[in-house]
Amino acid sequence: MAKVDVVERVTEIIAEVGAPLGIELVDLEYKREGRDMVVRVFLEKREGGINLDDCADVSRQLSDILDVEDFMPERYTLEVSSPGICRPLKKVADYERFLGHLIKVKTFEMLADEAGNKRKTFTGKLTGIADGVIGIDLTEGQKARVPLDKVAKANLEFEF
């Protein structure tokens, strides 16, 4: 099974296992580390936050299904955890949910803020999302608008 198919099937399984528990997938990595592949799953729970028991429960169920379906093309290690306080922002719904929070965005190419300063990293308060563009009040006092299709990576930042 191709890598993209593995990711797609594991995503489907997590949705099936997690939905009854109120748990959803934040991110999924499937990559080689050393000689083996790693399936790294990051989960969250909207109500009450995810805990170790939730992660262990999903891990057991996912592992059982992976063993039965046996579609993984090679040896792998399964890791299931929370995304942490600097969780990634992947979907439009993530940006909508975390309006007003401090974020860091890295782009594929240099983009200009409102003052014309070009950069690839934008850090500041997420002020909005509309028409595929996120608004950020930068920590330096400027504003920026970043198209989602230019975002290489985005995550929440810890506020002191």
UniProtKB/Swiss-Prot annotation:
Keyword Methyltransferase listed: no
Q: Which Pfam families match?
A: DUF150_C, RimP_N
Please give the chief subcellular localization of this protein. cytoplasm
Cytoplasm is among the record's keywords: yes
Alphabetical keyword list:
Cytoplasm, Ribosome biogenesis
Top-level division of the source organism's lineage = Bacteria
Q: Which GO terms describe its biological process?
A: ribosomal small subunit assembly; translation
Q: Which InterPro entries match?
A: Ribosome_maturation_RimP, RimP_C, RimP_C_sf, RimP_N, RimP_N_sf
What Gene Ontology cellular component terms go with this record? cytosol
Q: Which SUPFAM superfamilies match?
A: YhbC-like, C-terminal domain, YhbC-like, N-terminal domain
Task: Quote the subcellular location field of this record.
Answer: Cytoplasm
Q: Which NCBIfam families match?
A: PRK14647.1 (NF011241)
Q: State the family named in the UniProt similarity comment for this chain.
A: Belongs to the RimP family.
Function, in words: Required for maturation of 30S ribosomal subunits.
UniProt xrefs under HAMAP family: RimP
The entry's protein name is Ribosome maturation factor RimP
What gene codes for this chain? Answer: rimP
